[in-house]
């Protein structure tokens, strides 16, 4: 039996310790609970344990859960592949998107979002394919700055930062090395004057290295909810 509350408490304690070890400010890292394939009851249990940010991959499944849990002030993050014809649903239901890699799709989302009454701009992290893997989504590094510039007149979105899923490796040293590369890219953009504050890197297997490198948001599912259902 998975003890969701216990897992969340332990992970948040770990994050605080990692912040301290890395000379980071307390609570400078946001925990996103990745709840894809998990039930509304699982999410409610996590919420009652103090978890507010949840990430979903599968649109229709997530819309059902968002409706089921509309009585809770959850911050919903979309982290799945974005289909252009689903842009309106994403714009209507989510607070954040972490998987943007097409300017045309982002323009659609922006246009839909600004037409919804009582909706703030949707927060966006641009997905970067840091290792140029053919099997992963994300824009290449050479295109990143121009991509951001193209969003300047998109009134329905707020570009907050970048998201990356590096190539898998099982050693802390290699994980940290890759995350530092991403952090340097992020810092370079900030130093150029881009108003970015979110670096979405790190998952269950590598969030310690990600936090040491400078992550501001980690996406954790398995360590909270257990192995996901097939």
Regions found by a protein language model. Give the residues of each.
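Conserved alpha/beta-domain cores
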Residues: 1-205, 213
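Expand to "…catalyze enediolate/carbanion chemistry for C-C bond making/breaking, isomerization
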Residues: 211-212, 224-230
């Amino acid at each position: 039996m998975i003890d969701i509350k216990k897992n969340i408490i332990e992970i948040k304690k770990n994050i605080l310790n990692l912040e301290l070890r890395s000379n980071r400010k307390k609570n400078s890292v946001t925990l996103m609970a990745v709840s894809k394939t998990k039930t509304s009851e699982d999410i409610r249990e996590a919420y009652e344990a103090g978890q507010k940010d949840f990430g979903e991959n599968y649109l229709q499944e997530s819309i059902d859960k968002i409706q089921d849990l509309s009585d809770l002030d959850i911050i919903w993050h979309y982290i799945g592949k974005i289909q252009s014809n689903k842009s309106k649903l994403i714009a209507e239901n989510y607070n954040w998107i972490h998987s943007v890699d097409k300017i045309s799709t982002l323009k659609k989302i922006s246009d839909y979002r600004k037409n919804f009454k009582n909706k703030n701009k949707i927060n966006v992290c641009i997905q970067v394919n840091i290792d140029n893997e053919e099997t992963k989504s994300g824009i290449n590094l050479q295109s990143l700055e121009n991509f951001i510039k193209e969003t300047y007149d998109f009134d329905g979105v707020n570009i907050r930062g970048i998201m990356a899923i590096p190539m898998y490796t099982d050693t802390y040293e290699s994980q940290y090395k890759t995350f530092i590369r991403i952090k340097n890219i992020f810092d370079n953009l900030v130093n150029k004057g881009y108003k970015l504050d979110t670096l979405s890197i790190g998952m269950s297997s590598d969030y310690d290295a990600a936090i040491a490198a400078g992550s501001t948001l980690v996406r954790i599912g398995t360590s909270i909810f257990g192995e996901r259902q097939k």
